[in-house]
Amino acid sequence: MAFALGVSQDYPLILAANRDEMHERPSAPAEWWKDCPNILGGRDLLAGGTWLGVNRKGRLATVTNFRHEADNQSTISRGHLVSDYLATEGDAENFREKIDKEKKVFGPFNLLIFDGAIFHYFSNRAETARLEPGVHAISNVKRGTTLPKILRAKQGLEKCLSANDLIKCLFKLLSDANTYDDLSIAEETERMPHDATLFVKGPYYGTRSSTVVLFSNRGKVRFLERSFTAKGELRGECSYSFTLPENSKSAP
């Protein structure tokens, strides 16, 4: 995933992310949750959490696993980290304390939370950090790791910031199934399977959905999602837009 924080004058936060997952894992497309009406996002129908979501107060959260590190099968689904933050009333510091107490029961994770002003990074494999304004990218590895797909995502988002059609540019970036092993972007990194492409195609594992989230300087949020088949063909798409409460923070 890649996101721009405090870079665009029109959009204090721009996020573009792909969800790569086993095709057999059941999930639902993004919607306002019936059992928690303030949460908007897709849903993991196996464990009940989500990989990416926002709430009506302007919070955002998203999580990744560590693809090259084995999970403890007895752990709680990482998707609950996202839904728990979006459902809570506490601030980021309170949530950090909660994670510190419970992080051992989760498999390896990167968790990003946005409270409407500040982007926080949490992990049970790396140090907590407050992310500064700028363009960032992260994948299924520790923050700060350099991989072809991470560099491609960051560079692609930087170019999209000046595009005439921002949303179109972001979805085009997320649909990029090319590899970059023969370019300088890969010469600086260690080559690993699937780490050189943004959009993963495969019969068992691949990109299940692409999501673009925009927080505007006018207090509006747009949440757009496209879902895909195992062949990488478009399965469906949805778009949501809502206005934040006036007392919500609107800029990093």
Identify the role of each PLM range.
Residues 1-252:
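N-terminal nucleophile
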